[in-house]
Amino acid sequence: MNPPATSSAARALLAGLALAALSHAATASAKTVELLNVSYDPTRELYSDFDAAFARYWKAKTGDDVIVKQSHGGSGAQARSVIDGLQADVVTLALAADIDSLHAIAGLVPADWQSRLPENSAPYTSTIVLLVRRGNPRAIKDWDDIVRPGVSVIVPNPKTSGGARWAYLAAWGYAERRYGSKAKAREFVAALYRNVPVLDSGARGSTITFAQKEIGDVLLAWENEAFLAQKEFGAGRFETVVPSASILAEPPVAVVDKVVERRGTAAVARAYLEYLYSDEGQDIAGRNYYRPRSKAVAERYAGVFPKLKLFTIDEAFGGWSAAQKTHFADGGVFDQIYQK
């Protein structure tokens, strides 16, 4: 006599139990990872969009959830906070000198941190432009116009803000090329800072001073901040003046090794920064008015970003280490010329 066949109902029950067990195992193995990205002042919108995209990508790839927390402020001040103990898994700062300080002062990243990702670990670029009020009432056309007596210039403090250091060096580099000497460039930049009524700690603070508080005739702005000011504070209230020359700003990113090793987040942190170089990451940069590194993605934004002559920090100043020591260290050129 043959044993009775298993009924279809029993088979369905067994299959359901197996699926439930697999689902429970998958749920149990999935985890939630938290990262802290310590960034500079005007990247809030960029990383709000990027964090959501990366979370979707990582969930699809691994099944794990990622929650990315953000901290924003002047780049130099943010670097100091990380040195003083802020537990950043990654830093996305305004300039290489600030990440260099994490190595030099606290040993949080290796000396060769900049070689670990493409493009010297700078996944997007920007520059410094001049934002003026509607109708350009002070007839500002180029750098020379902002050093005229009586023109009020808004720019953050280069001791705390990365954007301010880029702006300072953009003005210096323009003047040295136009007038032919470092002495003339120093006079030019000194005249510029005589026109600065207040130094905010970061770029976003300066944008608010100019756009909301309506202080100043011209804002020395990150290019993305100029776009955002026109978008967020009312169309037609401001105009962007593209100078004849400016500096190629290359904001870098890095995993903070000592933190991720302790927290066990190294793999996710690396993937997070690597995803900035993906097509989606590059497109998000472009949508937020940062210049993509990818040539293919950059072509899609060719009509957005104006063409202008750009010089690099290496060409004009011998790199960030030399520029930081000469101009922004205690007792450096900025301290000597800024008499407030």
Model regions and ranges:
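N-terminal signal peptide c-region/cleavage motif recognized by signal peptidases
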Residues: L22-T27
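N-terminal segment of the mature folded domain
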Residues: A30-T160, K309, Y338-Q339
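Short beta-strand->loop
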Residues: V38-Y40, W113-P123, V132-R134, S152-R178, L192-V196, Q230-I247, V259, ...
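Extracellular/periplasmic juxtamembrane helices and adjacent flexible linkers that interface
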Residues: V260-K340
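Short helix-loop capping/hinge motifs at secondary-structure junctions, enriched
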Residues: G135-K141, T160, G173-S181, V259-A267
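Ligand-binding pocket segment of bilobal, Venus flytrap-like solute-binding proteins
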Residues: R178-S244
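A bilobed periplasmic-binding-protein/Venus flytrap-type ligand-binding module shared by bacterial periplasmic
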Residues: I128-N136, E250-A267, I284-N288
